[in-house]
Amino acid sequence: MAESFSFDVVSDFDRQELVNTLDQVKREISQRYDLKGTDTSVELDKENIFIITNSELTLNAVNDIIRQKAIKRNLSLKIFDYGETEMVSGNRIKQTILLKQGIKQEIAKKISKNIRDQIKKINVSINGETLRVASKSKNDLQLAIKLVSELEESLNIPLKANNFR
């Protein structure tokens, strides 16, 4: 029997699910009557989604479609950080949506401190953009997982517990 049990706290998303979501969004934009002829484009690069369209109304409709499709594909809406809209050539509007991935150092420290304050017999180590939570008791780890899910709401970042060993 193992002497110590552990799990990792990560903040990431399934990139293929995001690609599939944006494919569905593009398909709906091309088929919806109110969005036809708006010359709307949705592009994905490594860290951002770019939406270029004709009007604020169309931009809001596209953002709603992205949210709906992301929820259906089990993507957390917390991965989207909506940027400001800006005017580009030809009276068009561009919005950049930053994709949140990884746990920043200061947030990792907050999570670590919070877990240690609540559960005494637990070890939390920060490994780059992940946290490793270890304990000799599975019950303590289950409490830590519950605590992480509660912290997810207050920190406004998507957190997952994985690699439970």
Swiss-Prot record:
Entry keywords, A to Z: Nucleotide-binding
GO cellular component, one term: cytosol
Entries under SUPFAM superfamilies matching the protein: YajQ-like (SSF89963)
Alphabetized GO MF terms: nucleotide binding
InterPro entries cross-referenced by the UniProt entry: DUF520 (IPR007551), UPF0234-like_C (IPR035571), UPF0234_N (IPR035570), YajQ-like_sf (IPR036183)
Source superkingdom: Bacteria
Function: Nucleotide-binding protein.
HAMAP family listed in its UniProt record: YajQ
Family, as annotated: Belongs to the YajQ family.
Protein name: Nucleotide-binding protein A9601_05361
Annotated source species: Prochlorococcus marinus (strain AS9601)
